[in-house]
């Protein structure tokens, strides 16, 4: 299983600031608390778009951006890199210039891709603990 070490990366595109947070998740129960922490850390952001993959469970959210322009591109990058047990949140501070649907897809994709380029990828082996008593 390929996963990541926690990391973040910031880019500015047409005056909008995009902050990508990549987070390792141990279980699905962590997702809501990590999202809450990020919203607290980046108060006042315009959007908190995210996607996660945990085993066979995948989900994304556009958080008010036009449908399919934020969460799905984030998820696509995670899937294309065969990552698992990962939550990716891209925080956007609107800079006053509308990017259009295509521009948003490119911006969110670039944000996650740039963050991944600066993130340590970990190859985890799944093991089972077997206890034998005599």
Describe these PLM feature segments.
Residues 122-134:
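Short glycine-/aliphatic-rich beta-strand segments at the starts of folded cytosolic domains
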């Amino acid at each position: 299983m390929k996963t990541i070490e926690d990391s973040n990366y910031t880019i500015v595109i047409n005056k909008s600031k995009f902050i990508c947070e990549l987070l390792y998740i141990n279980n699905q129960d962590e997702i809501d608390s990590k999202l809450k922490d990020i919203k607290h850390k980046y108060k006042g952001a315009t959007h908190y778009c995210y996607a996660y993959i945990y085993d066979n469970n995948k989900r994304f959210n556009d958080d008010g951006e036009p449908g399919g322009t934020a969460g799905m591109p984030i998820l696509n990058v995670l899937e294309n890199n065969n990552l698992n047990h990962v939550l990716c949140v891209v925080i956007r501070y609107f800079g006053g210039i509308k990017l259009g649907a295509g521009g948003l897809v490119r911006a969110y994709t670039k944000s996650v891709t740039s963050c991944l380029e600066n993130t340590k990828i970990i190859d985890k082996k799944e093991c089972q603990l077997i206890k034998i008593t005599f």
